[in-house]
Amino acid sequence: PPKAAPAAILEAARAGIGFVVCITEGVPAQDEARVFATLQRDFPKTRLLGPNCPGIISPGKCNIGITAGEIAALPTAKGPNVGIVSRSGTLTYQALYELKQRNIGVSTCVGIGGDPVPGTSF
């Protein structure tokens, strides 16, 4: 739930988790700003992806978030292969689908979320 996300992010940081993915939609912008400032000040080694993001996928290697693994084509030795960074979850899924239809592999796809205060930006 959006109200619980800030506390969960900070709990993960306090536990020493270095990479936190928050897929939760609807986290108030002021809470996002407070959490991001706290992470920068008190937990500089913790990287936040999100909130309101689909996460990160490296087909065949890892999938952290809510991106369906079948939607992305595996990277190939011969290529072509691409990486994707996107603010829109829907457009991320569409890009993955279109690339797979054209036999273009994806090395890594990162959805950073479209909220005003993303934990990770371009």
Language model features with spans:
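Catalytic-core regions of core metabolic enzymes
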Residues: 1-122
